[in-house]
Curated annotation (Swiss-Prot):
L-aspartate binds at residues 131, 135-136. This is Argininosuccinate synthase. It holds the Pfam family Arginosuc_syn_C. NCBIfam families: argG (TIGR00032), PRK05370.1 (NF003779). It comes from Klebsiella pneumoniae (strain 342). It is an enzyme of class 6 (ligase). InterPro entries: Arg_succ_synth_type2_subfam, Arginosuc_syn_C, Arginosuc_syn_N, Arginosuc_synth, Arginosuc_synth_CS, Arginosuc_synth_type_1_subfam, AS_cat/multimer_dom_body, AS_multimer_C_tail. The gene is argG. Homotetramer. Gene3D superfamilies: 1.10.287.400, Argininosuccinate synthetase, chain A, domain 2, HUPs. L-citrulline binds at residues 99, 135, 139, 192, 201, 203, 280. Belongs to the argininosuccinate synthase family. Type 2 subfamily. Pathway: Amino-acid biosynthesis; L-arginine biosynthesis; L-arginine from L-ornithine and carbamoyl phosphate: step 2/3. Keywords: Amino-acid biosynthesis, Arginine biosynthesis, ATP-binding, Cytoplasm, Ligase, Nucleotide-binding. It is found in: Cytoplasm.
Length: 447
């Protein structure tokens, strides 16, 4: 059976991921006019720029949807976001600033939950607004087929008939008006925005040019921290974790994780925390550029990693970072539920996150400027008395350290021999521009 349909399947049920915007509205109406039977499915992901979810299914019905459902995905989205924090599943960083994979997390939840809802309604053809150049077309493809093995894909934006008739936003708007809907195009921004409760992505248009900076963006989850006219007073915040799970902010507990994440967003957003500018590699290996917001994820991530470094040993932390980057890349590629990702998630959550219990106090200032003021945990392996410079009882003596250093003579001698070998083969040469001249007899050994 063909998985991807190039032309509209007339007379058949088609589920469309419906946002209520111009693109999906025009696509739904066009499919109905051409003889298909569209069903609209809208994901409530707690988008910060959406204020009336209930109105979206009603609009879909007006445009010809046979059925329209609003699927609440917030609980599942936050659960996956917390799992990503526990695993450090983030692979794109620039200058120490992290992209928290908020769009890939949203696609993992949307792609599975909407297709599951379609399957309940006997709808086995799915369409969405992703384009052939982006990541989402592959993410949705993978998650959709994982959820429903019988699924077929129809995307109006891959259908030449749709493109010929409604290839641009102006044509879509004119089509809506001609069909009796007074649908006016929204004012074009200098970039496009996609968001969910975990974060916002700003990209394309003017942001495709690297000389367009974050300063052209109007944050939807935070503030313009770069604008000196925006007053941002410093704020102390406490974050409490229990077995890797964030449970309290400023001493306040929450009825559920959704409310906790909303409060984390409010706190971090007041400062513009978690905003970053990234150049990344798309799944197809072409580079793209995005400006991201994720105030709540950033706040929780900072506190989590502070506890991590105080609780676990160096080798465990190294594995956390290495496996986390690997897992982050799988998440980005739409493989969050693949076996290799589940294996990494299980080990990181079981052996790392389970020990992360404690409270971190931070002072947030402007943007990503913050200080850690205190770290408290019964699980800390950081013990100030072990390395104190003051007199007193110690777990080891100066004589112990002399013995330990003497044992290092073995590998130091081996290293000197290797340096000499490198010099003899021409790989290394003594130079005033390096520290190598200080290695005695590097060039003169044996002369």
């Amino acid at each position: 059976m063909t998985t991807i349909l190039k032309h509209l399947p007339v007379g058949q049920r088609i589920g469309i991921a419906f946002s209520g915007g111009l693109d999906t509205s025009a696509a739904l109406l066009w499919m109905r006019k051409k003889g298909a039977v569209p069903y609209a499915y809208t994901a409530n992901l707690g988008q910060p720029d959406e204020d009336d979810y209930d109105a979206i299914p009603r609009r879909a019905k007006e445009y010809g949807a046979e059925g329209a459902r609003l699927i609440d995905c917030r609980k599942q989205l936050v659960a996956e976001g917390i799992a990503a924090i526990q695993c450090g599943a983030f692979h794109n960083t620039t200058g120490g600033l992290t992209y928290f994979n908020t769009t890939p997390l949203g696609r993992a939840v949307t792609g599975t939950m909407l297709v599951a809802a379609m399957k309940e309604d006997g709808v086995n053809i799915w369409g969405d607004g992703s384009t052939y150049k982006g990541n989402d077309i592959e993410r949705f493809y993978r998650y959709g087929l994982l959820t429903n093995a019988e699924l077929q894909i129809y995307k109006p934006w891959l259908d030449s008939d749709f493109i010929d008739e409604l290839g641009g936003r102006h044509e879509m708007s004119e089509f809506m008006i001609a069909c009796g809907f007074d649908y006016k195009m929204s004012v074009e921004k200098a970039y496009s925005t996609d968001s969910n409760m975990l974060g916002a992505t700003h990209e394309a248009k003017d942001l495709e040019f690297l000389n367009s900076s974050v300063k052209i963006v109007n944050p939807i989850m935070g503030v313009k921290f770069w604008d000196e006219n925006v007053k941002i007073p410093a704020e102390e915040v406490t974050v409490l974790f229990e077995q890797g799970h964030p449970v309290a902010l400023n001493g306040k507990t929450f009825a559920d994780d959704v409310e906790m994440m909303l409060e984390a967003n409010r706190i971090g957003g007041r400062h513009g925390l978690g905003m970053s500018d990234q150049i990344e590699n798309r799944i197809i290996e072409a580079k793209s550029r995005g400006i991201y917001e994720a105030p709540g994820m950033a706040l929780l991530h900072i506190a989590y990693e502070r506890l991590l470094t105080g609780i676990h040993n160096e080798d465990t932390i190294e594995q956390y970072h290495a496996h986390g980057r690997q897992l982050g890349r799988l998440l980005y590629q739409g493989r969050w539920f693949d076996s290799q990702a589940l294996m990494l998630r299980d080990s990181l959550q079981r052996w790392v996150a389970s020990q992360i219990t404690g409270e971190v106090t931070l002072e947030l200032r402007r943007g990503n400027d913050y200080s850690i003021l205190n770290t408290v945990s019964d699980n800390l392996t950081y013990k100030a008395e072990r390395l104190t410079m003051e007199k007193g009882d110690s777990m080891f003596t100066a004589e112990d350290r002399i013995g330990q250093l003497t044992m290092r003579n073995l590998d130091i001698t081996d290293t000197r021999e290797k340096l000499f070998g490198y010099a003899q083969s021409g790989l290394l040469s003594a130079s005033s521009a390096t520290g190598l001249p200080q290695v005695e007899n590097l060039e003169n050994k044996g002369k």
